Each structure stands twice: as C-alpha cells, then as structure tokens.
C-alpha cells in the first residue's frame, strides 16, 4: 500500500500543515468520480446501536473533519460512521499555532486546537452536499467566549441546527482545550446540561418527526467515583450513548519524549490502556443500559477487539488513522 510513502512526505511537514495538505486533496475528490482513488472495499459487518444500523463497527472520531468538508471521500475509505466536528454556534479560530505535536516514537499526538471551526451554519451546508451512506455523527461544543454557566445555550443552538441532518449528535464536554469545559461533566452542571439536551431532543423529535440519538463524550481522566456519577446521570436522563474517551492530560507514558510537556490533550497509543480501562469500568456500571462507543489509541485489530471486549459496541479511530492510514480501516473492519 502507498500510505507509508505518503506518511513519510506528510511527516516532513508541520502536523497542521500536513492536515491542510491532505484535506486540500480530499476536498478535490470528495463528491466526484475521483473518489475512486481513495475508495476501499470492506466487508459488511452490520451493528445496531442507539437504534441505528451501522454497516460496520468502525467510525472516524471527531476532530479530523471539523467542518464536514470531506465526508464522502472519508466515507469511501470504508468507515461505517463518520463523526464530524467539534462545531460551535459561531466560527472561531481556535488557539494560537503551533497547537498540534507528534510524539512519533509513541505514535501519539498532543493537540490544543481549541475547537477551531467555521461555525455550525457552514457545517450544515457541507452536510447537505454529502452523499455518505453510513451513519453521520455531528459533534457539538461551546464557543470559547461563551461563559461556562451559559454553555448549555450553545449546545442547544447547535442541536437545533444539526438535528435534521445528523444520524446522531455527540455532546463534547470533555475537551481539555476550552477553559472550564470539563466542569460540565460534574454534579449539578451535568444534570442541568443533560436535562436541557433531553428536553430539546424531544422537542426536535416532535418538530421533525424523527428521533436522533444523543451521545455524551467523556474524558479519560475521571476518577472512579466521578465515572459512577456520570454513568448515573446518563441513565437518569435517558441519554442514548456515551463516547469514551476524549484525550488525556496524563503524561506518565510519554515522559522524556520530545513535545511531551506541551499543553493539550494526548491521544494515540499512550491513551490506549487508560481509555480501555474507563470503558471497562463504565460498562460494569452501566450494565447494558446504554451503549458505549470506544475511542482512544486504537491502532490495530487487537486494540479494537480490546475495546469491544471491555464493553464497547462500536469503536472509532483518529490518531491511529494518522499514523497507519486507510489500510488500518480495512484491516480492522475485515478482522474485528
């Protein structure tokens, strides 16, 4: 496969520049006959989750296609689902560059992107043009300049706009790169947010005559007692699923490596065991009451199987896709 050569060229570039170059090419082929250049045939492995049928259990995690610009090209590679975003009500530039760093030896990434995106209206226009036949998840967040105590309003604005076009909606309250965002995972703040989201979901179900499931994306840095409280809140508010996990602030597995002390969330292989353990604890606590989408350091069939064995119904990749490329999709879907 050609990807090792592509990767070698891309890894000569700054990580964000490499992403821009890749997306320039993908934008050229998405929705055109040139999609055949990136198309991969993968076997059907249907899975039902959150009331939806996924053609296979492997999805692309949020963060790669923040604005939904390359949905069809990415879909052609064989993903059963694609999660676009995180998107916010208004466009925002994100944090200052440089803001993403490769830990090549560890096959990890540290990012402090800060929800850079073109805004929810732009994303919706892109989604309208897409023809992806898998499940499209839309991951939503709050603007950086929205006070945390008013954060719920941003989620409800985004829900209203993406609801007609989403297969499911992911609520990102676990990015470490938006000040105060992770506080929404705790206690009354979480209950208030989930209550508002559930009410809005039922209101939009009536309006559009279709039910779009909602999943909450959580951090891997929650303590066991905090995880129990989160699980309890998700069940009480009849949330449809949980995505475990986002990036970690923990650097214990990358000490001494170049860029290890950069501020931001760590993803990739160093997150693998930590996220799997969160899934295992969450699964024991939920006891089948709502499904788990497993993400964090999946870079092989074995790593994907470990997430499923720990209790995940579906899995997603991001950093593994950067390091291994499209062949990883085919490998996981074929052998999982």
Curated annotation (Swiss-Prot):
Disulfide pattern: none
Question: Does the UniProt entry include the keyword Coiled coil?
Answer: no
Tell me what topology the record assigns in the membrane. Peripheral membrane protein
Q: Which residues are FMN-binding?
A: 62-66, 86, 139, 172, 217, 245, 268, 297, 318-319
Q: Which GO MF terms does the UniProt record name?
A: dihydroorotate dehydrogenase (quinone) activity
Tell where it localizes: Cell membrane
Could you give one GO CC term from the UniProt record? cytoplasm
* Residues that hold substrate according to the record: 66, 111-115, 172, 177, 246-247
| Similarity field | Belongs to the dihydroorotate dehydrogenase family. Type 2 subfamily.
Q: Output this protein's name.
A: Dihydroorotate dehydrogenase (quinone)
Q: Which organism is it from?
A: Klebsiella pneumoniae subsp. pneumoniae (strain ATCC 700721 / MGH 78578)
């Amino acid at each position: 496969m050609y990807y090792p050569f592509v990767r070698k060229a891309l890894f000569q570039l700054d990580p964000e520049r490499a992403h821009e170059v890749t997306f320039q090419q993908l934008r050229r082929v998405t929705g055109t006959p040139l999609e055949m250049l990136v198309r991969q045939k993968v076997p059907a492995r249907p899975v039902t989750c959150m009331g939806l049928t996924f053609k296979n259990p492997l999805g692309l995690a949020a963060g790669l296609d923040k604005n939904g610009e390359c949905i069809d090209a990415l879909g052609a590679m064989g993903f059963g689902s694609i999660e676009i975003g995180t998107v916010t009500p208004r466009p925002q530039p994100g944090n200052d560059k440089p803001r993403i760093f490769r830990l090549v030896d560890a096959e990890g990434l540290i990012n402090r992107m800060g929800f850079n995106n073109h805004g929810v209206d732009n994303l919706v226009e892109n989604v309208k043009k897409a023809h992806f036949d898998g499940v499209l998840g839309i991951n939503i967040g709050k603007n950086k300049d929205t006070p945390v105590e008013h954060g719920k309003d941003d989620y409800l604005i985004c829900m209203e706009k993406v609801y007609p076009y989403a297969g499911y909606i992911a609520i990102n309250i676990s990015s470490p790169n938006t000040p105060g965002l992770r506080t929404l995972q705790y206690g009354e703040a979480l209950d208030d947010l989930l209550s508002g989201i559930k009410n809005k979901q039922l209101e939009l179900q009536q309006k559009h005559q279709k039910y779009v499931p909602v999943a909450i994306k959580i951090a891997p840095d929650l303590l066991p007692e905090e995880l129990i409280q989160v699980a309890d809140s998700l069940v009480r508010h009849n949330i449809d699923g949980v995505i475990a996990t986002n990036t970690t602030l923990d650097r214990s597995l990358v000490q001494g490596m170049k860029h290890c002390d950069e501020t931001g969330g760590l993803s990739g292989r160093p997150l693998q065991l930590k996220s799997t353990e969160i899934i295992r604890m969450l699964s024991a606590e939920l006891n089948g009451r709502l499904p788990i989408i497993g993400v964090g350091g999946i870079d092989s069939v074995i790593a994907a199987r470990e997430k499923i064995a720990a209790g995940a119904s579906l899995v997603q990749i991001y950093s593994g896709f950067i390091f291994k490329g499209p062949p990883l999709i085919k490998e996981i879907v074929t052998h999982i």
